[in-house]
């Protein structure tokens, strides 16, 4: 019998996380695929003819959540400042330049994702 790299419990939890971030897959060049006994794989930076430039396997739902949250956060923080000097700052520094309302919206979105994932 082939070795399994993810428990059934973690498979179900990772599926919830992958589904919760469905909107991210429409915003950026990223997706999560169920890789069976190997867990879930985050694929990023697609190029036709080349495939995905980055792949990372996950067998823990919290690690998958943190990875997808990081990508969502970076997209939301960086996209509005592309082409400006602020784009040279790191993500947390850019976050600090946002209005308090926008900062709260982003933090609320993290709480929303946590609730969807039930973690």
Can you name each region flagged by the protein language model?
Residues 1-5, 111-119:
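Short intrinsically disordered terminal tails
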Residues 34-108:
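Acidic, low-complexity, intrinsically disordered interaction modules
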């Amino acid at each position: 019998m082939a070795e399994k790299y993810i428990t059934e419990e973690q498979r179900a939890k990772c599926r919830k996380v992958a589904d919760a971030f469905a909107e991210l897959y429409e915003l950026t060049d990223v997706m999560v695929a169920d890789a069976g006994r190997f867990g879930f794989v985050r694929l990023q930076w697609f190029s036709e003819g080349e495939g995905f430039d980055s792949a990372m396997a996950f067998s823990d739902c919290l690690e998958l959540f943190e990875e997808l949250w990081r990508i969502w956060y970076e997209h939301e923080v960086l996209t509005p400042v592309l082409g400006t000097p602020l784009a040279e700052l790191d993500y947390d520094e850019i976050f600090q330049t946002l209005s308090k309302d926008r900062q709260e919206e982003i933090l609320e979105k993290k709480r929303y994702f946590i609730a969807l994932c039930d973690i």
